[in-house]
A protein has these predicted regions:
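Active-site region of glycoside hydrolase catalytic domains
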Residues: 1-340
Length: 340
């Protein structure tokens, strides 16, 4: 219905936004609907965190494949659009220089992002997942695999932060995020030797590590034959401060620093050959942030929730000027090329 009704006006279609987050939080930790998990993973009334995430993910992958197949066979030729999927993409650094921790990075990436992208683009689950999970991974039929190969036109990358990955396959780990077999036996941690991987933000899961942006783009470029990419989400959050003055809430210097460093990292990846075609800041406005509700603010524009008044933050003015300056530079380069 969407292709038929809006295809003449929509150039880019995304079948899912962050399906890895939806599956992990809905069927492993249970903090998202339908809130299914084992007691060792969360507080749920029912569920199996060791099997259900993989069944749910498998169905997401197949439904993505069906949507892409429909679009390509019935609409793409006449409408001229592109179709892809948007993934939440974390970068990981090895906790140490050991081979075990370097392999833990590969498992962390495979059990979080490649879990979906490998079947959709390469037609099979990652080797790291097959080795650890075996028959717990659902199987694709021959028809599924044929449909899945090159099953998108672009990859949407939602990237905010990075972590360390520590081996739990050959070492003993405390039972935290990533350490279990169903998560890839790769402990996800933000600190090493008492230091965070990057400057902590007020939002407890964002650490400022712009190197991770360049590295995740380069990794995706190399693994998936430089499939076109869009940075579909990237941004910096502050905690809600109800007693602060309005002027202080608009002076978001740390957001400006974050955006500048991450945009520079994207530019570096592009100069090295990555086919990145667009960038979307999260977010234009303060908004309802899923399970965090109105307790976190990501907007370039401040929203007074009582009156709904919008006010430009420092970051909005900076980003407007950044785009204007980059546009002028590009126009200058094109003019020089025309003269030559």
């Amino acid at each position: 219905m969407c292709f038929r009704s809006f295809g003449d006006r929509v150039n880019y279609w995304a079948t899912f936004n962050e399906p890895n987050v939806a599956v992990i939080r809905g069927y492993r930790s249970g903090i998202y609907p339908p809130s299914r998990c084992c007691p060792s993973f969360g507080n749920c009334t029912a569920g199996d965190s060791t099997t259900e995430p993989f069944i749910a993910a498998h169905n997401v992958i197949l439904s993505h494949s069906s949507a892409v197949h429909l679009y390509r066979t019935k609409y793409q030729k006449t409408q001229g659009g592109s179709i892809g999927i948007v993934m939440n993409c974390l970068w990981y650094e090895p906790f140490s220089n050991s081979l075990e921790d370097k392999l833990a990075v590969e498992r962390a990436l495979s059990f979080y992002m490649n879990w979906f992208l490998d079947p959709i683009i390469l037609g099979k689950y990652p080797a790291e997942m097959k080795e650890i999970l075996g028959d717990h991974l659902p199987a694709f039929s021959k028809d599924d695999m044929e449909k899945l190969k090159n099953g998108l036109d672009f990859i949407g990358i939602n990237h905010y932060t990075s972590f360390y990955a520590k081996d739990c396959k050959f070492s003993t780990c405390e039972p935290k995020a990533g350490a279990s077999k169903t998560e890839g036996l790769s402990l996800r941690i933000a600190q090493k030797d008492g230091l965070f991987i990057g400057e902590p933000s007020e939002v407890d899961w964002i650490y400022v590590y712009p190197q991770g942006m360049e590295k995740i783009i380069t990794y995706i470029k190399d693994r998936y034959n430089n499939t076109p990419m869009f940075i579909t989400e990237n941004g910096y959050g502050y905690k809600e401060k109800p007693n602060f003055k309005r002027e202080d809430l608009l002076n978001d210097v740390k957001r400006v620093d974050y955006m500048r460093s991450y945009l520079d990292a994207i530019a570096t990846a592009v100069r090295k050959g990555a086919d990145v075609r667009g960038y979307f800041a999260w977010s234009l406005l303060d908004n309802f942030e899923w399970i965090s509700g109105y307790t976190e603010r990501f907007g370039l524009y401040h929203v007074d929730y009582a009156t709904l008044k919008r006010s430009a933050r420092l970051s909005a003015d900076w980003y407007r000027q950044f785009i204007a300056n980059e546009t002028k530079q590009c126009q200058s380069v094109f003019k020089e090329a025309d003269v030559k």
